[in-house]
UniProtKB/Swiss-Prot annotation:
Record keywords: Cytoplasm, Nucleus, Ribonucleoprotein, Ribosomal protein, RNA-binding, rRNA-binding
GO CC field: cytosolic small ribosomal subunit; nucleolus; small-subunit processome
Subunit details: Component of the small ribosomal subunit. Part of the small subunit (SSU) processome, composed of more than 70 proteins and the RNA chaperone small nucleolar RNA (snoRNA) U3.
Predominant localisation class: cytoplasm
Taxonomic path: Eukaryota, Metazoa, Chordata, Craniata, Vertebrata
Matches recorded under PROSITE patterns: RIBOSOMAL_S4E, S4
Role, per record: Component of the small ribosomal subunit. The ribosome is a large ribonucleoprotein complex responsible for the synthesis of proteins in the cell. Part of the small subunit (SSU) processome, first precursor of the small eukaryotic ribosomal subunit. During the assembly of the SSU processome in the nucleolus, many ribosome biogenesis factors, an RNA chaperone and ribosomal proteins associate with the nascent pre-rRNA and work in concert to generate RNA folding, modifications, rearrangements and cleavage as well as targeted degradation of pre-ribosomal RNA by the RNA exosome.
Official protein name in the record: Small ribosomal subunit protein eS4
Domain S4 RNA-binding: residue ranges: 42-105
Family to which the UniProt record says this protein belongs: Belongs to the eukaryotic ribosomal protein eS4 family.
A biological-process GO annotation: brain development
GO molecular function: RNA binding; rRNA binding; structural constituent of ribosome
Length: 263
């Protein structure tokens, strides 16, 4: 019988979007407990070593982190298996680089560089709103932040913009039709579009219909929707492709066209 927390993660059982090959070893870094779920996060070590190629081994990542070079959401993190997740801002002051963890249309975390100006804030989805002790209202976000005394107009599923220096809410976007959203789970993970309508199913999952910028429509559960902008204006910069998923044939044609133009 297992007693206590699991401390290991086999490479074969690691989430597919980490893109670890099966033959390099037996184990994968098991993310520490933190603000994002194990299957929905990217450990810091994989981001620095496998994505940015700033280190060759786990030991080198540890040396980088222990020199306090890496900040996540404005806080220094020295744990190499710290779970970074959707919308987190990773800053490396030594190189003057800032990254926002955001999904590409294949559902993987992409290396998305952002400006210093954009690195000062992040967007968070409101998961719960509760009244705490002594009648103090709280809201809980997707990255496990608890914020007291929020604006009473903010409801569950809305998106708030948080200033990372102060941790205060500076603005918010309502969850409503016509707003821009990104899908953060399910088969359409990473796609971006405008909310067209919401089907309510009491006792089951609400379904949201989304239309992307080239006119393709798709539907997903309400829990997978993350509002990222008012109307067609996103509040964060978007990765290449702008969240439009192409069919296999369209991707092939695009590759061939790029090949011909370069030759």
């Amino acid at each position: 019988m297992a007693r206590g927390p699991k401390k290991h993660l086999k490479r074969v059982a690691a989430p597919k979007h980490w893109m670890l090959d099966k033959l390099t070893g037996v184990f994968a870094p098991r993310p520490s407990t933190g603000p994002h779920k194990l299957r929905e996060c990217l450990p810091l070590i994989i981001f620095l070593r496998n994505r940015l190629k700033y280190a060759l081994t786990g030991d080198e990542v540890k040396k980088i982190c222990m020199q306090r070079f890496i900040k996540i959401d404005g806080k220094v993190r020295t744990d190499i298996t710290y779970p970074t997740g959707f919308m987190d801002v990773v800053s490396i002051e030594k190189t003057g680089e800032n990254f926002r963890l955001i999904y590409d249309v294949k559902g993987r975390f992409t290396v998305h560089r952002i400006t210093n100006e954009e690195a000062k804030y992040k967007l968070c989805k409101v998961r719960k709103i509760l009244i705490g002790t002594k009648g103090i209202p709280h809201l809980v976000t997707h990255d496990a932040r608890t914020i007291r005394y929020p604006d009473p107009l903010i409801k569950v599923n809305d998106t708030i913009r948080i200033d990372l220096d102060t941790g205060k809410i500076t603005d918010f976007i309502k969850f409503e039709t016509g707003n821009m959203c990104m899908v953060t789970g399910g088969a359409n993970l990473g796609r971006i579009g405008v909310i067209t309508n919401r089907e309510k199913h009491p006792g089951s999952f609400d379904v949201v219909h989304v239309k992307d910028s080239i006119g393709n429509s798709f539907a997903t559960r309400l829990s997978n929707i993350f509002v990222i902008g008012k109307g067609n204006k996103p509040w964060v910069s978007l990765p290449r492709g702008k969240g439009v998923r192409l069919t296999i044939a369209e991707e092939r044609d695009k590759r061939l066209a790029a090949k011909q133009s370069s030759s």
